[in-house]
A protein has these predicted regions:
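Short regulatory helix/loop adjacent to the ATP-binding pocket of P-loop NTPases
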Residues: 1-11
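Non-catalytic interfacial helical region
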Residues: 13-16
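P-loop NTPase motor-domain active sites and their immediate coupling elements
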Residues: 50, 98, 270-273
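Short pre-active-site segment immediately N-terminal to the catalytic Zn-binding motif
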Residues: 99-109
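Soluble catalytic regions of large protease machineries
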Residues: 107-112, 118-308
């Protein structure tokens, strides 16, 4: 953070924001870091860039080191694409904690929860394809996770896509309710993320039918002395704040209702998928083609986790 006084005219006139690299930028960064390790013939930065959408330069450097460690642990001389894929998963979802043993009834709840996320994501056409579903606990504190991959970089997100993302997040809790008639604390992280999307939907993107097309909260700034989100007074009245809260609840309840209706229509798939997940613990698209319509798979972006 810089003091705003330093940014007055005549002091620092040029401000450059270094954003996350696009596909071509990732290739250039990877070209530098791949020189430090031995990779399998035919493997290059272009293929790895396809599985690293959203990664920063530091993330890519860490990825190369992590992939080399994965290859070393399996006794390989050269690093393969599978090693990079495993490294991405470790970075995004954390290290597996197979020593953590859940009670049978808890494993069942987690299995239904994660299969709910997976089925919702696969049923909504605008959502990123499901890459992996697992009920193996991870070091980051999750009891299970669902990984999704986009097919390309996204620069614009529609109103419907935001609503569908909330549906996918709420589908874990909806699956628990359909299977057991009650909900658990496993959706805590999902609720936090759904609330964040709903708040931005209303206050940043001007998509609320009630509050209209106005920006109530600025995007949080992380460079050159601009104010950070949450610092300072609110830009709107208490009445507007109440309307924002009502709008957030309405969006989440609407998404929860859609998630329940969707999973009810695919109840047989939900039950079959949960049973298969309990049996194998981790599923890839190749292992459940009858359950999840396959979509082109490219990179990790979203991890939907079950909290303790």
């Amino acid at each position: 953070m810089l003091d705003p006084a330093l940014l007055r005219a005549g002091r620092i006139d040029r401000q450059i924001l270094v954003d996350r690299p696009d596909r071509k930028g990732r290739q250039a960064i990877l070209k530098v870091h791949l020189q430090k390790i031995t990779v399998e013939p035919g493997l290059n930065g272009e293929r790895i860039a396809d599985i690293t959408t959203g990664f920063t330069g530091a993330d890519l450097a860490n990825l190369v080191n992590e992939a080399a460690i994965v290859a070393t642990r399996r006794g390989a001389v050269a690093v393969s694409l599978d090693d990079f894929t495993a490294a991405v998963e470790r970075i995004v979802a954390g290290v597996e904690r197979k020593s953590s043993v859940l009670r049978p009834e808890e494993r069942q709840v987690v299995a239904y929860h994660e299969m709910g996320h997976a089925l919702a994501a696969s049923s909504l056409p605008a959502m990123d394809p499901v890459h992996k579903v697992s009920i193996v606990p991870r070091a980051i504190g999750s009891l299970g996770y669902t990984l999704q991959r986009p097919t390309e970089d996204h620069f614009l997100i529609s109103c419907q896509m935001l609503k569908d993302r909330i549906v996918v997040l709420m589908a874990g809790r909806a699956a628990e309710y359909l299977a057991y008639g009650q909900i658990s604390t496993g959706a805590a992280d999902d609720l936090a993320r759904a609330t964040d999307i709903a708040r931005q939907f209303i206050t940043r993107f001007g998509m609320s039918p009630v509050l209209g097309q106005s920006v109530l909260e600025r995007q949080s700034a992380t460079y050159l002395g601009e104010r950070m989100q949450g610092v300072g007074e609110k830009d709107y009245s208490e009445q507007t704040a109440r309307e924002v809260d009502i709008g957030i609840r309405a969006l989440i309840e609407e998404a929860y209702g859609r998630a329940k209706a969707l999973l009810e229509s695919r109840r047989a798939d939900l039950d079959a998928g949960a049973r298969l997940l309990l049996e194998r613990e981790t599923l890839t698209p190749e292992e459940f083609p009858a359950l999840l319509p396959l979509k082109p798979v490219a990179v990790f972006t979203q991890v939907t986790e079950t909290s303790p």
